[in-house]
Amino acid sequence: ERMKTALAYVREGHLGRCLVAKAWESTKQGSIGRQPDGEAPKEVDYDMWLGSAPKRPFNPRRFHGSWRWFFDYGAGDLGNDGVHRLDMAFAALSAAVETEGGEPLRMPRRISGTGGKWYFDDAQEWPDTMQVTYEYPGTPPRILTYEMRIWSPYKYLGEGEGAAVFGDRGYIILGNRGWRAYTNGGKMVKEHGGD
C-alpha cells in the first residue's frame, strides 16, 4: 500500500523533472565480534547448511543471524537491507521518468562505488561503509545513489533506512512506515503512513 500510494503521487507529476534518487541505510548495527571456530550444534547438519559454499570450520559468526556478513554466504547489508531501499528508489525514479514521457528505467549503463570495512573491528568481511552510484541511460541520464553507514547513530532525512526522489518542484521520502512529500522549498505537503 505504501509504495502503491507513493508511486501514484509521483505519477501525478508533483515532483516535476526528476534526475536524482537516493537510497540509504544509516542505522547503527552492532559489531558481530570475533569468536573461535568450534563444533556445530548437534541438531545442525552443517555440511547441508553449507551447501555449495566453500567448506569452512563451524563458527557461530558464520552461522544464523550473521552469515550475511561473509563473502561465502551473503552480500553484506547491500544485499540484506539495501536491495529493499534501492527497489523503492528505483521504482519511484522510474515512475517519475515515465511521467515526464521517458522510457521506464532498465539496466544502468554505469555503476561505480567505494567503501570498506572502516568502522568495526570484527569478523565481518563485507563493508560497513559504502557509496554506490548507478547511472541510467537517457536524455538526460538519471542517477541513483546508495549510501550505507551501518555504524551511524543518526537518521538521514528523518529515516534510518529509506529512499528519496528529488525533482525541480518537490521531493518524496519513502521510509519503512510510510512516505512524505515536500515542495521544492521544503514544506511538507502530503504524508501517508502504513506498510
PLM region descriptions:
Residues K4-R11, G16-G76, N80-D195:
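Contiguous beta-strand/loop segments that form the cofactor/metal-binding neighborhood of enzyme cores
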